[in-house]
Structure formats: structure tokens, C-alpha cells
Amino acid sequence: MSYVVLVADRLTKSYDGQPALRELSFELQAGRVMGFLGPNGAGKTTAIRILTTILRPTSGRFVIDGVGSEDPARVRPRIGVLPETLGLPNQITGAEYIGYFAQLYGRRRADARRHGLATLELVGMRERAGRLIRTYSHGMRQRLGIARALINDPVVLFLDEPVAGLDPRGQLDLLALLRDIAKDRGTAIILCSHGLSEVEDACDDVLVLSEGRVVASGSVSDVLALARQRVSGTDLRIHVPTSAAERANATLRAIPAIESVRGGIVDGRLEVSLARGPDQAIEGTTNEILDQLLGDEIPVLGFEVEGSRLQDAFIELTEGRSS
């Protein structure tokens, strides 16, 4: 059963009277992955530094696994952190490196080695445990960093730009690993990133920051739906025979859910924008459009739905454009 492991309550941080973070509040459940998104200066880094006890908030508080931010010494054993820059030593092996950190958390040498190897196996690095770190690729180094962050069995794992610098396959593999860690171990994860696609692919929840404030939060689909109400553009691409393009245009313009129709006269390819409504379901609208076209005996050669991506939502929400 999922339960709340992190509660942030009106976290605020100011420098010389200028707020860098304004009343950040959210909850995170065990086994879920949350993405922090926002442009430079949005407050993401400040939020992470507060939640990992590097900074003290000007006001507000947070609780991790029942321990409040007033007691940072007890918070730290409950969290794991993968910083953007690792700074790994090159002249020792991965097993020696992880075993050292296991000993720092109170394990005896033999037990620390066993636990370290088990953690390396968890991140797919068991076979490379005996190699010197200087021989590791960038992806291996990131996995080693994740192993270090997991060595104390944290309740919440914080990752800053975890897939930066990886090739596309390496990114997908690492994101899959993070999802597995959350699902199989029940670890809550906060992923701070500028890479919108990785957040969309890996996260259950998204928190969008702009100028220190939360401008949107919820599941990925919730944030997309919120932005979708405000973003204009092409929703559908419909291909009909050129000979039927004028009839298709007239049919589409008569449908109340459609805001505009463009193109089609030359090549039969129509671009359709839907009218915006807070409760609009695009699936029902597309079914209505298809039924109407086919009912008017207009052949449909192609039908493509263009859903908003997180990139669109991010730009719309952080720039604050109105509909």
C-alpha cells in the first residue's frame, strides 16, 4: 500500500529579501517518481538543497519518513542524493568505493562488502565491481553514483540531471532502472531535470516551477491536460482524397467541437484545431469527427491525433501565456 513519505509545507527561501522559493508545498508517496521542472532560476535547485538539508528554509518545513526538517541529522540517513557532478576517485574499484560508503553507515568490513556488491547488482554493475573506476564509461559512473545514493536504503532518492551526457540508449536504460527501483523497493524518487522527455517517460508526477512558485503540479497527464486547455495549434491531421477535400472541409466546419480547418484543397491533407474546453475529451471528439466524415461518405485515408507533449506544457505554463 502506498503512503506519504515526504511532505513539504510552504517552504520559502529568500536571499537579501529576494525570494528564490515561494511557499513550496507538495506530498510524495512511496514508490512514486516526481519530476521537478522549470527554467533556470525557477527554484528547482534551491528546493532540492533544502530537502537534502544543505540549506535551511527561511520559513516553512518538511517531513521525511516522520522526521521534521528541524532535525537534519536524523533526516540525512533517510535520503540518498545523486548530485549533478559526482567527482569519483579513479584509482579504486567500484566495489571498494561502494564498500567504503557502506562502512560509513556503520557496517563492518565483510558485511559492507556484501551489501555493496548487492547494491551494485541492483544497478546492473555487479560484473564490473572489480574494475577500476577510471575504466568506467559515463553511464557506468552514473550507475555507480546511484548505487552510492542507495547504499543506506533511503526512503527518498534525489537525483540531479541523472541522464545528462548519456546517449539515447543509455538514457532509456537508466530511466528504466529508476522506475524499477521505485516500483520494486518502494523508494520515492525526485528527479530534477532540464530534459523534458526523460521526465515525461520516467515520472508519475510533475511539479513545474517558475520564478520560485509552483505553476502546475499533478500527474504527467494532469499537467498536459492543464496546458492543453491553453495551448492553441493543430490537434488533428486528416487525409482525404483531393476530390473530396471541399466536402470534407464543409463537414468539419459544421462540427461544434472544431475551431478551425486549414489546407486540403491541393493535396487533401487537412489540419484541424479543436475548440478548447475544460472538460473536453479528445477521444470522444475524434470519434464524432470520424463518424461525421464517414456518414457523409467521405473516404478517410489518414487520421493522426497530435497530442500536446510535456515540452508544450512546460513552455506554456512557465511563460504564463494566456489562451
Where are these regions (language model features)?
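Hydrophobic anchor residue at the start of the ABC signature
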Residues: I146
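ABC transporter nucleotide-binding domain
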Residues: L175-R276
